[in-house]
């Protein structure tokens, strides 16, 4: 039979509380450092990239977890257009920063019920606003994702007053999408 743990002393509690507060402060500082400053005027471009099925088999920063040719083309485009204002739409983790460490996962919005996609979209839109990229009316949000990812939430961003662009909306198929990204790189 196991012996119950001894209760913490006041000194141990104080040390744990201090460690917790220091860790929280460090996490907040790291999060704040990832959010770019807001330019004084003009539109603020943000790029949202949809996740892809092909993933590495070990945990990695989100932008390295996805490994398909389509992902590489999307990522290269985002790094040219808005390198400090790029986020990832993840079926498994909602909205993530490219440097967030993610484990491999098998989840897709394809085949999900409308209610589940709507709940996902609510979480994504709510999380997006927390990044504080700037006043909603100045945000131009480019969404690079399949319809099952775009459709549930782009209207929410528009409702908040953001301009939403869907440059790949009429382009069907992975090959034509990669060709679009290649053409943008050449321009």
What residues fall within each predicted segment?
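Peripheral peptide segments
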Residues: 2-187
């Amino acid at each position: 039979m196991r012996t119950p743990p001894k209760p913490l002393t006041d000194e141990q509690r104080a040390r744990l509380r201090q460690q917790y507060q220091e860790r929280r402060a460090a996490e907040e500082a790291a999060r704040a450092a990832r959010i770019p400053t807001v330019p004084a005027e003009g539109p603020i471009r943000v790029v949202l990239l949809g996740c892809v099925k092909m993933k590495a088999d070990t945990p990695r920063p989100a932008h390295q977890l996805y490994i398909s040719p389509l992902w590489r083309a999307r990522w290269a485009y985002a790094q040219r257009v808005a390198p400090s204002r790029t986020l990832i739409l993840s079926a498994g983790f909602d909205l993530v920063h490219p440097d967030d460490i993610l484990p491999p996962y098998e989840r897709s919005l394809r085949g999900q019920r409308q209610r589940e996609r709507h709940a996902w979209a609510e979480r994504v839109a709510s999380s997006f606003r927390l990044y504080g990229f700037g006043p909603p009316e100045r945000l131009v949000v480019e969404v690079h994702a399949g319809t099952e990812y775009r459709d549930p939430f782009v209207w929410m961003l528009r409702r908040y007053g953001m301009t939403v662009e869907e440059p790949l909306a009429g382009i069907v198929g992975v090959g034509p999408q990669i060709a679009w990204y290649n053409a943008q790189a050449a321009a």
